[in-house]
Design a protein with these regions (language model features):
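Short catalytic micro-motifs in class I SAM-dependent methyltransferases
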Residues: 130-134
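Conserved beta-strand/loop positions that form the S-adenosyl-L-methionine
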Residues: 60
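A conserved beta-strand element that flanks and buttresses the S-adenosyl-L-methionine
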Residues: 127
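Nucleotide-sugar donor-binding and catalytic loop/hinge architecture
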Residues: 116-120
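Conserved helix-to-beta-strand junction in the class I
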Residues: 147-154
Length: 238
């Protein structure tokens, strides 16, 4: 049964936001290498896309812009990057980026998210890496997908990652422990199935909301987008 309510969503979002504010430096230090799956993404994009003189990229939940660094190494195109996130500390050394400081989750829940992107043009490439699992509530995740579809040039590409950490016994065990701790502190949380809290290193109070996606749930996203987009590739990596 799906039980997520706005009070729970707000609490989870606040915990995740606090996590990234407090742990930005140590978290970024562990996120310096490209994801293995990005190489396969490039293969899906193809040589024609990567050989263009200019590419526009909308990156939702951009983090440290690792993907753009990786993309720049594999194309000669000039990148026009529109980066959206709520943790500007990650971007202190980044330049030539149109940055939008935005609480994505809150605006998805109050239905204002698309309006914050009005100044962003249609892009050749729209991506959300490491974001979808931080969004509580299925309707909010679908709203993110809809916005990505609406902000992507027809015939171009959308890249999305869905974390499935319940397949990893070590992470699954950590999630169970951290979630039990969170529920002791916040007994009113109404979590959906496969909703978890995860901790971080030695930060006992640092908790972030993470959803572990099932294959069936990912199928739902594919089906939802089927009348507006064609699935090019789907794979497990990292």
């Amino acid at each position: 049964m799906q039980r997520m309510d706005i009070k729970t969503a707000s609490t989870l979002n606040a915990l995740t936001s606090d996590f990234y504010t407090r742990c930005a430096a140590s978290f970024a230090q562990t996120r310096t290498r490209p994801w293995h799956g990005w190489q396969r993404c490039l293969e899906a994009l193809g040589d024609v896309m990567l050989s263009r003189q200019e590419l526009s990229v909308l990156d939702l939940g951009c983090g440290t812009l690792r993907f753009e660094d990786f993309l720049a190494e594999h194309t000669h195109a000039h990148l026009n990057v529109y980066a959206v996130d709520s943790c500007e500390a990650f971007l202190e050394n980044k330049h030539n980026v149109h940055f939008i400081n935005l609480d994505i989750i809150s605006t998805l829940w109050d239905d204002t998210f698309p309006s914050h992107l009005n100044d962003v043009p249609l892009c050749n490439l729209t991506c959300a890496f490491g974001l979808m699992h931080h969004i509580p509530g299925m309707h909010a995740r679908i709203a993110l997908l809809d916005t990505m579809l609406n902000k992507t040039t027809s015939g171009e590409y959308i890249l999305i990652s869905f974390w499935q950490f319940e397949h990893n016994e070590r992470l699954s065990r950590k999630a169970r422990t951290a979630t039990a701790t969170a529920l002791e502190r916040y007994p009113d949380l109404q979590l959906d199935e496969s909703d978890w809290l995860l901790g971080w290193q030695d930060e006992a109070d640092a908790l972030r909301y993470c959803r572990s996606f099932t294959d069936a749930e990912i199928d739902t996203f594919v089906t939802h987008a089927a009348d507006r987009a064609q699935l090019v590739d789907r794979f497990n990596a990292d």
